[in-house]
């Protein structure tokens, strides 16, 4: 008989723990989720799952007694909570103060007491102290912003600040008549002739020709250096004395010619820099 009672107690715990967890999680999801729609959906789903578990548990415990009374009491409270959720969802937040007294009266509890012992009403009342504090903070922040704009600090070069209007900014920031037409102007507002700032065409052509000649000279020097290097390798690799003399006879004029070209190009570069 004792073993049978122990089995009943374990089965009762298996029944009530999911119901308790479902009710607590539903209330938490309904209170603390950021999205109201997701909170309502999750709370409804959890409540429906808890109701299904409760129905299966009710059919499981077919005996009469205090356990079945507790299950009936839980069913009534659960249905009332589900109705409250649906009514709040349909009517909005205004249905909360209307349903709370009805539920309190049905349960048998009195009105909640505040910190000073007085009964607290279900409706929200404005707190004058909180409104005054919010008003003072808003006014102080607004005055700070106005003072920062009115100071209009100068830059390091003494130019007026960007926050100033064009009339107060000075002569350097006044819009000239040519700026409205999209023309380039100087600091005084006078138009600038872009053709005067461009170099003459002869100078440009001279620079192009000089750059082309320098490029051709570099290519010529590179070819001569490669030819001298090839002859030097042939001279080092030649084992026959006659072959070495032949390569040396060709290498000496190439080296002298390369030295003359290098000296001539250096002289031209020096004369060009002197100009």
UniProtKB/Swiss-Prot annotation:
Key words of the record: Membrane, Mitochondrion, Transmembrane, Transmembrane helix
Location relative to the cell: Mitochondrion membrane
Region (Disordered): 140-191
Highest taxon above the source species: Eukaryota
Membrane topology, from the record: Multi-pass membrane protein
A single GO cellular-component term on record: mitochondrial membrane
Main location per the UniProt record: mitochondrion
Membrane-spanning intervals of the chain: 15-35, 39-59, 70-90
Protein name: Uncharacterized mitochondrial protein AtMg00670
Phylogenetic placement of the source organism: Eukaryota, Viridiplantae, Streptophyta, Embryophyta, Tracheophyta
């Amino acid at each position: 008989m004792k073993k049978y009672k122990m089995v009943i107690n374990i089965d009762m715990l298996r029944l009530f723990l999911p119901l308790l967890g479902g009710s607590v999680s539903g209330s938490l999801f309904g209170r603390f989720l950021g999205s109201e729609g997701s909170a309502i959906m999750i709370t409804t789903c959890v409540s429906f799952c808890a109701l299904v578990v409760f129905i299966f548990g009710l059919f499981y415990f077919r005996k009469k007694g205090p356990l079945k009374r507790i299950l009936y009491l839980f069913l009534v409270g659960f249905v009332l909570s589900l109705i409250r959720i649906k009514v709040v969802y349909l009517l909005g937040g205004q249905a909360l103060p209307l349903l709370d007294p009805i539920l309190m009266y049905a349960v048998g509890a009195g009105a909640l007491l505040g910190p000073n012992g007085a009964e607290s009403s279900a409706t929200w009342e404005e707190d004058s102290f909180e409104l005054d504090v919010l008003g003072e903070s808003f006014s102080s922040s607004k005055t700070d912003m106005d003072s920062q704009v009115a100071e209009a600090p100068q830059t390091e070069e003494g130019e007026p600040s960007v926050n100033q209007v064009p009339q107060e900014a000075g002569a350097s920031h006044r819009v000239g008549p040519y700026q409205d037409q999209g023309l380039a102007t100087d600091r005084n507002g006078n138009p600038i002739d872009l053709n005067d700032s461009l170099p003459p065409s002869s100078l440009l052509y001279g620079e192009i020709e000089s750059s082309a000649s320098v490029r051709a000279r570099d290519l010529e020097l590179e070819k001569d250096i490669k030819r001298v290097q090839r002859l030097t390798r042939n001279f080092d690799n030649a084992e026959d004395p006659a072959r070495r003399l032949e390569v040396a006879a060709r290498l000496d004029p190439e080296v002298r010619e390369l030295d003359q070209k290098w000296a001539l190009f250096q002289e031209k570069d020096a004369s060009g820099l002197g100009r």
